[in-house]
Amino acid sequence: SGKRVVFTMGKGGVGKTTLATEIALKLTKLGAKVHLTTTDPANHLNYNLAVQAGITVSRIDEAEVLEAYKNEVRSKAAETMTAEDMEYIEEDLRSPCTQEIAVFRAFAEIVDKAENEVVVIDTAPTGHTLLLLDATESYHKEVQRTHGDTPASVRKLLPRLRNQQETEVVIVTLPEATPVFEAERLQMDLQRAGINNKWWVVNACLSLTDTENSFLRAKAQNELIWIKKVEELSKGNAALIAW
């Protein structure tokens, strides 16, 4: 389809990582150069499977990118500032927003790799991802306002995420109330941010199995209302995966 950036998003435990890996493997088989990464601190990526298939694998380690960002700021500041001024810089670097900026910039650098390869991003659970999207919008507005010294990857980030020809978000859920409601909220936030989402995946569907267990059959029956809800939210662009 020509997409350069593919996200898997949704609640924790719905199968985002597995799906992201499967997408990366399929793209590789189709001849694409693929970079698979995760923003999830839990980091469940199967590195061996991906690397053996020729996929570049990485993760955004928050502690690592924070230290790298601090060192970059210190290095630049030391070129022009006095020791007294550097104390103020160190105080600023202790601010919680420093970590947000560091993670955001690392995220922008990963997405920028779409210049040369297809980037598949396994995201952290919904709340963490929404904070990242909000940071993207805020940072973009600040860049436009100040015209400051900003990395090209940051300047290009939001336009790229909003470009339907380049970016696709696959919302992943389970056929249950809480995951579907969280996914619906995520869809609304993506729409507010102007980021394209067409496809949904409903994982672990008992209703697609031939179970004869009475409890599981009752659970499978209860799934149908949530599968119908996803069909409506996705306008029919939903894939179901059996348990």
Walk through the language-model features, giving the residues of each.
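Pre-Walker A (Motif I) flank of P-loop NTPase domains
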Residues: 2-6
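Glycine-rich nucleotide/cofactor/substrate-binding loop typically near the N-terminus or early
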Residues: 53-83
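Phosphate/Mg2+-binding loops and adjacent switch elements
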Residues: 80-178, 182-185
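Walker A/P-loop NTP-binding active-site region of P-loop NTPases
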Residues: 7-65, 133-137
